[in-house]
Amino acid sequence: MHRSKFLVIVDDTDELKTAVQFAAQRASNTKGGLVLLSVIEYADTQQWKSVEDIIHQEARAEAEKKLQEWSEIAFNISGQTPEIVIKEGVVSEEIINYINEDKKIRFLVLAASGEDNPGPLVSLLAGQRSGKLPIPTVVIPGGLTSEEIDDLASRAQ
């Protein structure tokens, strides 16, 4: 069976909660899947190989921890366990590459911050790099209540 998937990028922004809530609810309502993607971006520390290895291990452990936490939140919303994926590299490039790899991903779900600045991912992926994305980007407005997000996710059947 071909299940469409919703992709959410796990990062350190406040908007992440809104994106996860909407995407998990939409996935549940449409019997689709949910993918949580974390991209680890490293600084160049090649002259210090042992330090670089430690930094990579710590960054990966932190990404795994965050993904597990958000996976549990998504499960509590949708009743299904999301796929979790970790990539390493430039954030925008890795997101686009992953979308191109997984042909079942139908929507990239982002959330705006609700302030004057829409947030780093929205600025990058719904703005500068939007023409490079092979799927629609859904931007959830910032400042919505949890009930409004659930209503929005339910209406978009």
Annotate the PLM regions.
Residues N100-Q157:
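Gly/Ser-rich helix-loop-strand patches that form or flank binding pockets
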